[in-house]
Amino acid sequence: MSTLKVNTIKDNGTAIDLENGILIGGASPLQNYTASGTEPSSGNANGDYWYDTGNSKFYQYWDSAFREITIVAPSYYYGDRGVFGGGTDTNLTLDYITIATAGNATDFGDAWYLKESGGAASDGSRGFWYGGLNSANIVSNNGYSITFATLGNATNTIGDINNSRARGSMCCNKDYIIHTGGQSGYNTNTTNTILRFTVVSGYMAASSFGNMDATKMGHSMWNDTSRYLTFSGTNSTADIAAGSFTSSGASWIAQLTGNGSQPTGAAGDETRAITFAGTSGTQLDTVVIQNNSNATSFGQLNTNHWTPGASTDGSRIVFAGGSWSGNQNDMSYITIATTGNSYDFGDLTVARARATGCAGN
């Protein structure tokens, strides 16, 4: 180790050049940075940075190896475990999957009641379902919730004595759940009403939160922390509407690429939403949540789905179920960062159409 003693520093217009550099704690204060798809194999020194362009990961070199640096932001409305419930099957079973690992679904527990065509949303730790039709086609004003980390049956923690809804859609930003549209009767009374639930630990009741730009049912929704989007629906054109979690109402902003008939399944991350577009049984569209721009094509599902459910971990979306040719148990997945067609994920425990899904930890 060397000792450097400085008595006087004078401004002579040129910098002092230390031939062997300066080390602080064994590392140079001047660090190299490399962005590449493969790890730098030579010339690495403690403190050097490498950005892995192929996997969007960041590393720093210490003790003869690159160590990953991660900053994991809290995810308030998605997570590692996806849960699918409801649907037209006469079964109370809730299915769950680990979204990062392809495979068949497993029994999570039982729903609080048997309903299809309800809405689903997540605050990151709990999943919520509201509304729907029972086997007698009676529209419900009740809902239920589960805790993602604990397998078991759902409990009744959400509802609205003034509004029964089926074939609506839901989303959540941790603080609030937004429910839009749907029908108050079986195939009748399609509405443009928006309901808002304040997320609390106990029972949650809805309050009126304005109206959408059009009546809708069978539509899909996704959101970031401040803004939510609704995607089309049977009783509308291929429109995209936007609303705020803190200001009532939602209005038209853009268009889907397809006809938007009953997209039902949408998910994404904190920047982008991907929705089943409704043009065929396979078309997927994508939008940037904060932009007022028309959707663009993302790709195709690998199997025909119609009225699927969706869940996401922020990197991958799994679409499940549907009714293209009878009730389906297929699941397909896409990677949010990469446009293209989906891949087979596995099977639900039961075939179901109009199932709804959400995810959390």
Question: Which residues make up each language-model segment?
Answer:
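Polar, enzyme-active/binding microenvironments
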Residues: 2-361
